[in-house]
UniProtKB/Swiss-Prot annotation:
Domain of life: Bacteria
Compartments (UniProt record): Cytoplasm
Intrachain S-S bonds: none
Organism: Yersinia pestis bv. Antiqua (strain Angola)
Annotated function: Activates expression of the rhaBAD and rhaT operons.
Keywords: Activator, Cytoplasm, DNA-binding, Repeat, Rhamnose metabolism, Transcription, Transcription regulation
All copies of domain HTH araC/xylS-type, residue ranges: 174-272
Protein's recorded name: HTH-type transcriptional activator RhaS
UniProt-recorded Gene Ontology molecular function terms: DNA-binding transcription factor activity; sequence-specific DNA binding
Gene3D superfamilies given in the database record: Homeodomain-like (1.10.10.60), Jelly Rolls (2.60.120.10)
SMART domains: HTH_ARAC (SM00342)
Species classification: Bacteria, Pseudomonadati, Pseudomonadota, Gammaproteobacteria, Enterobacterales
DNA-binding region: 191-212, 239-262
Signal peptide segment: none
Site (Interaction with sigma-70): D241, D250
Length: 273
């Protein structure tokens, strides 16, 4: 597995933060690094496999990667990212309490993926632009200023995650996307789901395609296939059981869709493990 080292990304040993833009981000194999990373999705779509678990990416996704996590990007489609790198929550010279504004693992569950709205993305652009420039010197005042901008960015993201579930259409669409991520195996009737999230059906179709590059049904099928691939790799369930557990009503149809998506059948994938 590829290991990325801070010495290759930070401008100096005293620099607390580094910015790496990916415009676009191509597929990148599984890796980990000796620093922390905040991945901010500005445009496009893709799949982020985080510690073996697949997450679909779209504009407004924010991913928090620790120094012991492993992750990769695949199936990228004009995926534009900004990566904010920092050494560790407790590695700043003038900041304390950074961990308060980061995801916290609870009972073995780490909420690594947040979502913010377009307004927050616009608000943080100037902060990211400031962080792109290394501190003017190693003087304490320059380091302190640089760290203070990072804290502003972190607080903006934290506030954006707390408030993005607003009652406007964008907020309700984000709620719907999160619901699909967590309930992909359930039978979905799009008119009923549109009513549930108070979205006109036409608006749901249009906005979801704008956010993900896929029709609603294609997006749901993709979620199910990604989860099925994860179970094929990490569980002992049979192919048939996995098909039903992931929301497919017919295992043969599941195998056909799986081969079309990943260029190999479920059984071929499992035989390679």
């Amino acid at each position: 597995m590829t290991v990325l080292h801070s010495i290759d990304f930070f401008s100096s040993s005293s620099a607390p933060v580094a910015i790496e833009a990916r415009a676009p981000q191509s597929a990148f194999p599984e890796h980990h690094h000796d620093f922390y990373e905040i991945v901010i999705v500005e445009e496009g779509a893709g799949v982020h496999v985080f510690n073996g678990n697949p997450y679909t990416l779209s504009r407004g996704c924010v991913c928090f990667v620790r120094d012991h996590d492993r992750h990769l990007f695949e199936s990228t489609d004009d995926l534009f990212l900004t990566n904010v790198l920092f050494r560790a929550p407790d590695a700043f010279r003038f900041l304390s309490g950074v961990g308060h504004f980061l995801p916290r693992e609870c009972d073995g569950v780490y909420p690594s993926h947040w979502r913010v709205n377009g307004q927050v993305l616009q608000q943080i652009k100037c902060l990211i632009a400031c962080l792109e420039h290394a501190p003017k010197s190693d003087q304490v005042e320059d380091i302190a200023l640089h760290e203070s901008v990072f804290m502003q960015l972190l607080v903006k993201l934290w506030q954006g995650c707390q408030t993005q579930v607003g009652d406007d259409q964008e907020g309700r669409l984000y709620q719907l996307l999160d619901w699909l991520q967590n309930n992909y195996s359930e039978a979905v009737e799009w008119p009923e789901l549109a009513d549930r999230f108070a979205l006109p059906l036409r608006t749901l179709h249009r906005q979801l395609k704008n956010k993900t590059g896929m029709t609603p049904q294609r997006y749901l099928t993709r979620l199910r296939l990604l989860q099925a691939r994860h179970q094929l790799c990490y569980s002992d369930n049979s192919v048939t059981d996995i098909a039903y557990l992931c929301g497919f009503g017919d295992s043969n149809h599941f195998s056909t869709l799986f081969k079309r998506e990943f260029s190999q059948s479920p059984r071929d994938l499992r035989s390679q493990l």
